[in-house]
Design a protein with these regions (language model features):
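Polybasic, low-complexity RNA-engagement segments
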Residues: 1-45, 288-291, 298-445
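Conserved AdoMet
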Residues: 31-88
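Conserved class I S-adenosyl-L-methionine
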Residues: 99-108
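Conserved SAM-binding loop of SAM-dependent methyltransferases across substrates and taxa
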Residues: 109-122
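Helix-to-beta-strand junctions that scaffold the AdoMet/dcAdoMet cofactor pocket
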Residues: 121, 217-219
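S-adenosyl-L-methionine
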Residues: 129-167
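Class I S-adenosyl-L-methionine
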Residues: 169, 222-225, 230-342
Length: 445
């Protein structure tokens, strides 16, 4: 049952189209996944998922919900991210290029951040921020699972970031917290949480977040604002008010045939260009309700230069581990937080004073004069000389993911793989492989 106030508003806005809109709520949910470009070595078969392309996302696919791809070892290895198809649109509109500096300001749980990272292909810097500490941990875990090496995951208030990163980013995504009306079909909580004053409350918060984002974008940079709501107050209304207050921003006109135009006639005193924003309607495409606006800041200046984070010296234990295993590293510089070593992009600015959950690629920790590699490094690695591979259906693979030791004559640190995908570490003593798959991720056989 839709909230009465919501239904009345949508009936008035959509007129004769309201019947089709209402009927879309009885349609089966669209389930989607997005392939991870960073996992190019995959040799397995995904045909059982009955994949069909998502028109607006080259790496996006609809899948048969009964196939349950989230239970496959391929999901654990970061081959794909399960994501609602319409939610794939904002990152495609932002379209970051390898080498750019990109900010995802409201990033949890990580669907759009992992999509942006896939476009950067390990080059440049991606800063992912989430103000909610619990959700920020989920974000960090998803960045790890997909093998992303050039991201800084933060748990900060947007205003604090504005003070640190003025004019620093080439591109910014603001997937703003909203009333969630586009998720009514998918999440019952979105329906029960809705109230008549929800839209205005959300719009005020969205304008504050946009103001913070604007100060971090370089002149000439691109900003995408998106929501998963139908509310004109939170969509065209927010963008219109932002544009009137920030004349150095304008709406970019992009040709995207899959989406419907924004509706300047639904808000008072509309700013120029609202018709070039985008609405995704569940009765017009296979996906949930979304809105997106692509904004450009006037000018053309290089991103601001910030003091770099100083590099740390490589501990001898890490050097010895690499000498023994031949484990590759991405380009970058070494950082140490206590006993833990990270490899981060060279351009990473100073992070002192920020709540950092993840910096680049976690390599591992120096413990009692030895080096123990991190799970994140295993997921980033494409290959290792000392590795063992199992087919997806091999019972030994299920045993590994459950935390069991495995019979093996191998010695030393060993990379466990399936069909060209790395899953984690094990350590052999000549008789068996001791399991180093993280306990929090283990699943019963």
């Amino acid at each position: 049952m839709l909230p009465e106030g919501f239904a009345a508003r949508m009936r008035a806005l959509l007129g004769s189209e309201y019947g089709d809109f209402l009927a879309s709520f009885d349609r089966p949910l669209c389930t989607g996944l997005r392939k991870n470009p960073l996992k190019a070595g995959f040799t397995g078969d995904l045909s059982r998922f009955s994949l069909a392309p998502v028109p607006w996302c080259p790496t996006g696919f609809y899948y048969d919900a009964a196939s349950r791809p989230g239970l496959s070892p391929y999901h654990a290895a970061g081959l794909y991210y399960l994501q609602e198809p319409s939610a794939m649109a904002p990152a495609e509109l932002l379209d970051p290029q390898p080498g750019e500096r990109v900010l995802d300001l409201c990033a949890a749980p990580g669907g759009k951040s992992t999509q942006l990272a896939g476009k950067l292909l390990g080059k440049g810097l991606l800063v992912c921020n989430e103000i909610n500490a619990k959700r920020a941990k989920i974000l960090s875990g998803n960045m790890e699972r997909l093998g992303i090496s050039n991201a800084l995951v933060l748990n900060e208030h947007p205003k604090k970031l504005t003070e640190r990163f003025a004019g620093y980013f080439d591109k910014i995504l603001v997937d703003a917290p909203c009333s969630g009306e586009g998720m009514f079909r998918k999440e019952e909580a979105a329906v029960t949480d809705w109230a008549e004053d929800t839209n205005a409350i959300c719009a005020n918060r969205q304008l504050e977040i946009l103001a913070s984002a604007a100060g971090m974008l370089r002149p000439g940079g691109r900003l995408v604002y998106s929501t998963c709501t139908f509310s004109p107050v939170e969509n065209e209304g927010v963008i219109s008010e932002f544009l009137w207050k920030n004349p150095d921003f304008s709406v970019e006109k992009l040709d995207v045939p899959f989406f419907s135009p924004g509706r300047p006639d639904w808000v008072p005193n509309p700013a120029p260009g609202l018709e070039h924003t985008f609405r995704l309607w569940p009765h017009r495409l296979l996906g949930e309700g979304h809105y997106a606006a692509v904004l450009r800041r006037t000018g053309d200046e290089a991103p601001a230069a910030l003091s770099p984070e100083p590099a740390a010296k490589c501990p001898p234990e890490l050097a010895a581990f690499r000498g023994q295993t031949g484990a590759a590293l991405p380009e970058g510089k070494l950082l140490r937080f206590g006993d833990v070593c990270y490899l981060v992009p060279q351009e990473l600015p100073e992070v002192k004073g920020l709540r950092v959950l993840r910096a680049g690629l976690e390599l591992g920790a120096v413990l009692k004069n030895r080096f123990e590699p991190a799970h994140a490094w295993a997921l980033w690695l494409q290959t290792l000389e000392n590795s063992v591979s199992f087919e997806e259906a091999d019972p030994l693979l299920a045993r590994y993911l459950s935390g069991d030791v495995l019979p093996s004559g191998r010695r030393g640190w060993t990379l466990v793989q399936t069909d060209g995908l790395s899953l984690g570490w094990a350590k052999g003593d000549g008789n068996q492989l001791k399991n180093h798959y993280p306990k929090a991720l283990r699943r019963p056989v």
